[in-house]
Amino acid sequence: MAAPNDPELTRRRQRQEDFLRGTSKINFDDHVDHHVLSGKTAIITGGASGLGLGIAKALSDNGCRVAVLDLSECAEAGTDESNIESPKLFKCDVSSWESLLAAFQEVMLWSADRLDIVVLSAGVRSHNIKDLILKRAVGSASTPVKPPSSVFDVNLLGTYYSAYLALWYFTNLESKSDGLESSSWRPQLLFIGSLASYIEQPLSADYCASKHGVRGLWKSVRSHSASFGGCQTNLLAPTFIDNRQGSTKSRGDGALISLTTDVKLGEVADVVAGALRCICDNNIEG
């Protein structure tokens, strides 16, 4: 048992107190050095469209080798599956442990056993719990029908599986490290949450619950990131994002909203810039 004046115990207590108080505010005037991305390897789950695709392209443009893990082909041209320096698609279902593990193993072979960045952006749209109940209850048999679980399967379970594998590989690779990597670089684990990680979105019960869960998952590992290869963890929680063409726009999760609603929309570029700042600045952890 550690003594009351044990320096290590004091350090751990101080770190816990710091996280309870919250991390310091980000200075957005500070320069972001994108050069640190050169030669790094990144995995982006759900990187074939939307925010994930935007982050994947930005990392690739800055010299990072990017592996996109998704069920779909990339939504835009330019993803070259034969060029190791371009985003490469590895098809997988993040809600399946076996599929996700196989994809991570493929990426490690492709990257010559290197992994520096993992961005967890895979997600699916919500179901309206009122619609589910009313449509299935009116004129139906008296036995309730099981509600769909795909939102939990992808948004929460898939994120947990992906985070688990990222932390496992970060830890494993550190144990094999030759110590030549720059001491200022830390492996990066970036969770993509949502506005729904913090506030309610009426009737989007499965989506809100899953995104609150993502935030809880991130907070549960943040204070012990040094145990997992010394990694740095952050959470981005985008609001409604303008990431579609035409008369409708979407949230970060892709759920459509009407342009007639009085909602201020963010831009994909804003979220991408935030993601790169989190990944490139080792002073940000929150």
From Swiss-Prot:
What pathway does this protein act in? Secondary metabolite biosynthesis
Q: Where does NADP(+) bind?
A: 49, 51, 93, 207, 211, 241, 245
Q: Which PROSITE patterns match?
A: ADH_SHORT (PS00061)
Identify the EC number(s).
Answer: 1.1.1.-
Subcellular location as annotated: Cytoplasm, Cytosol
Tell me the InterPro entries matching this sequence.
NAD(P)-bd_dom_sf, Sc_DH/Rdtase_CS, SDR_fam
Q: Source organism's superkingdom? A: Eukaryota
Q: What pairs make up the disulfide bonds?
A: none
Keyword terms: Cytoplasm, NADP, Oxidoreductase
User: Molecular function terms in GO for this entry?
Assistant: oxidoreductase activity, acting on the CH-OH group of donors, NAD or NADP as acceptor
Keyword Cytoplasm in the entry? The reply is yes
**What top-level class of enzyme does the UniProt entry assign?**
oxidoreductase
Q: What are the annotated GO cellular component locations?
A: cytosol
Locate the active site. Answer: 207, 211
Where mainly located? cytoplasm
Complex formation: Homodimer.
What family name appears in the similarity comment?
A: Belongs to the short-chain dehydrogenases/reductases (SDR) family.
Summarizing the function annotation, the protein's role is: NADP-dependent dehydrogenase; part of the gene cluster that mediates the biosynthesis of squalestatin S1 (SQS1, also known as zaragozic acid A), a heavily oxidized fungal polyketide that offers potent cholesterol lowering activity by targeting squalene synthase (SS). SQS1 is composed of a 2,8-dioxobicyclic[3.2.1]octane-3,4,5-tricarboxyclic acid core that is connected to two lipophilic polyketide arms.
Identification of the protein by name? NADP-dependent dehydrogenase clz5
Gene name tied to this protein: clz5
